[in-house]
């Protein structure tokens, strides 16, 4: 444990940032799972409502990923890869049907 006042403060700041980053990453993962679930629903029952749900889920996931990249919680290549995976999931469903 640190004895110097500035070192103690840095430890507190690092912990605060770790928790903030963890919540952002968790939110990104949750939105990605919701998107994949919406894509599966669309695959099982391709309808206009399902397509709208997929588009809304994609928009929410893209937005959260972009915000995480902007705050430097995710590296920009990691964010781009996640967005690419989301797009490919929908592309495979739409080209198959």
Curated annotation (Swiss-Prot):
* InterPro entries assigned to the protein according to its UniProt record, in alphabetical order: Ribosomal_bS20, Ribosomal_bS20_sf
The keyword Cell inner membrane is assigned to this record: no
Record keywords, A-Z = Ribonucleoprotein, Ribosomal protein, RNA-binding, rRNA-binding
Give GO BP annotations, semicolon-separated.
Answer: translation
Superkingdom of the organism of origin: Bacteria
GO CC annotation: cytosol; small ribosomal subunit
Q: Which GO terms describe its molecular function?
A: small ribosomal subunit rRNA binding; structural constituent of ribosome
- Return the PANTHER family for the record: 30S RIBOSOMAL PROTEIN S20 (PTHR33398), SMALL RIBOSOMAL SUBUNIT PROTEIN BS20C (PTHR33398:SF1)
Q: What does this protein do?
A: Binds directly to 16S ribosomal RNA.
The Swiss-Prot or TrEMBL record describes its family as follows: Belongs to the bacterial ribosomal protein bS20 family.
Can you say what this protein is called?
Answer: Small ribosomal subunit protein bS20
Originating organism: Gloeothece citriformis (strain PCC 7424)
Give the encoding gene's name: rpsT
